[in-house]
Amino acid sequence: MDNLRGVAGLAALAMLAMTGLMHAGQIRDALEPAASTVRIASTQANDALRLAMGGQGGQKSAPVAEPDPQLAMTTDAAGRLRDKIPADLYPYFDVYLYVSKAAEGALAQHLYIFHKDAANNLVYEENFPVSTGRERHERYFTSTPVGLFELDPNRFETSHYSRTWHARMPWAMFLNATIHGKQTGVALHSSGNAHAVLLGNRASGGCVRLPPEKAAELFHRFQKEEQGMVPVFAYDSTHNRTSGDGLIVRDSSGNPVLAPGYRVLVFIEDYPGGPALVAVVA
């Protein structure tokens, strides 16, 4: 999908800001008073919103009759993040990656990037096609795991080689998780030129393949800008894996146990995308 551009893009972002603010109000009601809320916002969106609503004496402009499909998808992805992430995780992460591993649908096989600004607003950056697992039995079941994940600070590799698939995994950023009792081999990494044509389809052995230029960009960005102390995710013995719901380890005083990592939170789910949202400025 192309990024939002020009006046149409600003109007779309304005409606996105309105939607985010409504969700933020709901979040505030649900969370404890001291908790920060996260909503969709941007300076451009606020400027466009003022233009759309009219700046003179509260006068309003003509209705916007055609909602932007990109807006609907971005709002949907942001809403899924808001609903999934526990409030006590927000202070520890700056970048949020949403991945839909669905085979079909508006959000399917795409990664959406959001970052948190100084006011704790969740700001949309961009989205692009990816390839997740083929979801079938091969050498093993080629499934991409779902849930909330941190990135493993000890497994950022510019050129990893998979002995299982006898394939290179450039710019590999492994998930920091134990699944089925062992450290996962699932990573976000470059598709490489040979598999780039398959982006937007289920095509991997379980990893999340990214466009080559995006994999390199995120790899360097996270290493340069996002290192910090993050919560240690708890182990879910019922499902024999690291918690995918964002449950964290706490000490005897109830404080989160922190460890060096990346302030990046990844949410992967099998969700195709909801119906198009109708947003009208009346």
Question: Which positions does each model-derived feature cover?
Answer:
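N-terminal hydrophobic or amphipathic segments with adjacent small-residue motifs
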Residues: 11-14, 141, 194, 200-201
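Generic hydrophobic, helix-prone segments enriched in Leu/Val/Ile
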Residues: 17, 97, 218-221
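Surface-exposed beta-strand edges and flanking loops
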Residues: 53, 99-101, 132, 267-270
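Generic detector of solvent-exposed, compositionally biased contiguous segments
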Residues: 53-81, 143-150, 222-248
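N-terminal secretory targeting signals
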Residues: 1-85, 279-282
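Exported/periplasmic cell-wall-interacting domains
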Residues: 157-282
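Feature targets compositionally biased, intrinsically disordered low-complexity regions
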Residues: 5-8, 19, 24, 53-57, ...
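Gly/Pro-biased beta-strand-loop elements
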Residues: 75-195
